Amino acid sequence: MNMSLRWLPLLALLVATPAAAADNTDTALQQRGQYLATAADCVACHTAPHGQPYAGGLTVPTPIGSIISTNITPSKTAGIGNYTEQQFSDALRKGIRADGKHLYPAMPYTAYAQITDDDVHALYAYFMHGVAPVDSKPAPTRLPFPFNIRLSMAAWNLLFLDSKPFTPDPAKGAAWNRGAYLARGPAHCSTCHTPRNLLMAEKSSRELAGGAVGTWFAPNITADPTSGIGNWSAAELVAYLKLGHVSGKAQAAGPMAEAVDNSLRHLTDGDLQAIAAYLKTVPPRHDPADTRAVDSWGGPSAEPDMARTALPDDADKMSGAQVYDAYCASCHQARGEGSFDGGLPPLFHNTATGRTDTANLVMVILDGIRWHTDDSGVHMPGFAHELSDRQIATVGNWLLQHYGNPAATVSVEQVRTLRAGGAPSHLVLLARLAIIVIVLLLSAVIFWLLRRRKRSHTKTL
């Protein structure tokens, strides 16, 4: 009896060891899934302002109407808690929900299609076991006809969805392949940085050549040295992805600041270096309007020193120098040189003032900049409530003439449009007109066939 008791601790250890190993494996798998979800920046779209993580409810403006993000917590009543792994994979990589209905490509499943089976498995483990369920269902998306017919996305997918997962290029090194996988797949760089055609599909011939993201412009990040990031070093690219700014070149704002804040700064240095290595090899796409590198324009100017004269009674008649002196010079300095080792960036040698597309310059003045680092954060206030459309256009043009690309311009109408949320899209109207034309053509064909049949029948008689 005593001999049997001696073996009990050993037996307990043998039984416990596989369970502990399984727990460790599950934990490691969930941690890997969490890292991938961070790389994919899922939280950015699936979290409403001041809402619970991944509970959805964020309104995403698109050219076809506003799309409301869904709850992707493991809630069984409001989220994806009842999804099988295959259903999760189909939603992630094919844009098909568990009920068989199609998602809209505002959810970047065209990029997530590149994610490997193993990484989908890790993501599923994280979302099912590492995310807190939230039993709150967001309002449904209600798009205007004909885009409310989700089945139409099946045809769109046939035309534009490449459902093959990423395949490493054996001619490239491990770092390049890792960077290509992250950039093309989870990080979905092309979703924002590639222009789109009339049907809102990415133009593959212009991959990463720059595209509109609502009211912002996602710039060219190909290897072109003038229009893109070809003149950036790999170290500068890594610093930008990690910190959100590189002094003398650029600072993240708008959706890119969110991507840095929520996603990119949390990636390992090795992965950031891999992404940089890949981006440095993307085929260059040049914009003929760019005659020199967009971050090379301008120099310090002292004109604000001469702007401290009596202001006009009508604020809209203030000169650009006067607006700058009143609202900008306290941080960016009288000569536009910035301060604090680039924490307050110079306005020359800055992509915001060097591009011919001035949307980002206007949006920064309207909305400001907000992003964080591990140690601190940067906050530039927006002036949408302080400055009129004309004042913003005036100071914008003054900045371009003195610190940036003098060929670029800002118009009052442009400011008014961006302030209102961007130019209205005619895509819904065009789609409806196309349906009317198709119906008329089909009706004409049917009418012709019926008349032909009637004539044939008459001749027979």
Task: Please provide the spans of the model-predicted regions.
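Sec/Tat-exported extracytoplasmic proteins
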Residues: A40-D41, H46-P49, K76, L92-G100, ...
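Sequence/structural segment immediately N-terminal to covalent heme-attachment motifs in c-type
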Residues: T27-A48, P53-P61, M153-N157, T167-N197, ...
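C-type cytochrome heme c attachment motif
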Residues: Y35-T47, T70-N71, Q87-K94, P105, ...
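Extended intrinsically disordered, low-complexity coil regions enriched in Ser, Thr, Gly, Ala
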Residues: N82-Q87, R97-Y104, P195-A201, A209-V213, ...
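Active-site substrate-binding loop specific to GH73 endo-beta-N-acetylglucosaminidase modules
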Residues: A55-G65, P195-G244
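Axial heme c-ligation environment in periplasmic c-type cytochrome domains
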Residues: S66-N82, R93-D118, P138-L143, A218-I229, ...
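Post-cleavage N-terminal segment of exported redox proteins
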Residues: M1-A28, I67-T70, A91, I96-D99, ...
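C-terminal cell-surface addressing/anchoring modules of secreted/extracellular proteins
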Residues: G422-I438
